[in-house]
């Protein structure tokens, strides 16, 4: 039977080292971690950033940049700091966490079922969305509104998510529709972020925030165009565990 096969497989593998990387096992709807998978045995590791920790860092960096550059960031002077958000995969726990992290830091998040809603808003130029709310930032006695103008899952027609080409098309549409209302571009990863950066925000001087440490994003940071990235790796941990060596220092036990 299927259950018998699963039991036999689990029995055969129960003592083998297990390394999770890039994505923490989680519920695709809520982002809640699968602690059974993360504690499969004593040699189970996750290599990478804690999804929530990295997400909070990205959100904090966006907020700090806005605050530090408040005199110049409002491109049309309307008192609203507008941002657009490229969402990688609405069912991926890293994407969920990164979207929540940005919204939490900027005060645009709305709680749904005990957590900040991570769904895309579509278009929200008038601030009427129920998925997000307008945030506010007070700098030097002046209060500015922060608004998520638009966000969408970057899924192409073949069903691939985290799609850079789709993000490039999205920024073309958004910039044509919103123009100088867009003050900040934020992405769940560098691939989508760089597509938007190269497609529009670089030429406009609009700050772009990504996540991953892709080589082209690192180069763009050096040139002063992209302002945030985070990177991870798993190979050393897996190799050392297979050779019965000490695990890679980047591995994290979350249980």
Report residues per predicted region:
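A residue-level marker of the well-folded mature domains of exported/periplasmic proteins
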Residues: 1-255
